[in-house]
Amino acid sequence: MFATSIILMFLFATTSCNEPSLIGADVIDTDRPDVLSTDTLTLFSSSVEDDSIRTYNGLNLLTTYLCGVLEDPIFGKSTSEINAELRVAGSVPDTTFFQNISTGLTELDSVVFILEYDTTKFFGNNITQQDISVYLLDESMDNRETYYSDDNFLAGDLLVTETINPSQFDTLTIIGGDTVLTPPIMRLVLSGADAQAHPLFSDILFKDFSSYQYYESDTSLLQVLNGVKVLVENSTPTKDLMMAFKLSASSVSGMFLHYHSPTDTSFYRFRFTSNGAQMTSFEHDHAGSPVEPFIDGIADETDGEEYIFIQGMQGLNGKIRIPYTSGLQNPIINQAQLKLTIATMVPGDVTFYRDNPLEQLFLSKKNAEGDLIIIADLNTAIEVGSLTGFFGGNLVEKTENNIVINTYTMNISEHLQDMINGVETSDEIFISTASKAQSANRSIIFGTGHPTYAPKLNVTYTINQ
């Protein structure tokens, strides 16, 4: 068993990183009379709305959190809000600090809310103005719960709001009187009198010696500070960007209280930590958008649409039906590859959306409960650590007939065999992106109604005598 595993690991490691290949398929003698190939199986395509997706589980945190209002000219409006708990820093300021608040010897200078950008996950036009706000949560979160993208939390008092240009991010900031080099960050500042007058600080966190308890433990802090909601206001001047931030994965994100005494200047940071609940809430509105008539179950949807629409967040998934596998003459599937082609020149599309399609696609099926789970071929590829080599699904640029096209190719050999054998009773497979909760990108694929670049299933099989 161990030796077999070593051999398999070697074979997977030597598989091409661009195109998926099934081990053994390249040694099948296609000249044998019992080995046949076909690419003419009937396929039907459509686009479907996704159910909620998981955006928080304490054992498996996201590394990036989307935030914004995006009005996509094809997909319609998408909104993402961040809800997160803050936690204490671990070291409590000296008790003298709190004793001197009521006498005025310790004074709050400003409150700075910092979030580290994850610019690699931005989608849209980052040279833009965004009205971004931080609110205090009016209800508590629970780090023992699992939260989904359709969960949300009520916003209470406004903490801070500013109009920002995300392309002009800070990499230098002042912390405790020192200028510090940081990753790209967003800084929202509540200064001077505004900070001192805010009830969170004047009545709780910066009141007098009684405030000391809220710096001692997370339990005490969460009694008075449920957490924060970060969102882009619907009134924002432009709605063509989805930003992304790092919370617990950042060394700088948090809420900083800057203060001074007659002899010292310092700060205290409330942090986002892996112990705190943190999640994103998504909303999608396709009403009136070009994509609406293509969505399964919304209009008079018919299989064989010209386009398939796939989006990150809680956005649309593609659906492929393979209804007529019975014509394959009792086959043993050697290889089955589903090929999809990126659509070009879609009317009304915008360059900075079209030119940043999804880099990796996944295929799923519905289980008995109606939940999407990945197909067997993808599960095997993940288990052996060879996603693109064994399953594929990565975006590949190639030239066919002197035309540059972008394609995704995915192995579905095991899944197709299970369909033929009756193990899988549904003829549907669903197309989505990897790490959907952390991506706002989207792809438009030519559907089965396209005359040239329709999805194609290339199958090589042996007739089972």
Across the structure, where does each feature detected by a protein language model lie?
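Secreted, disulfide-rich extracellular signaling modules
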Residues: F2-Q465
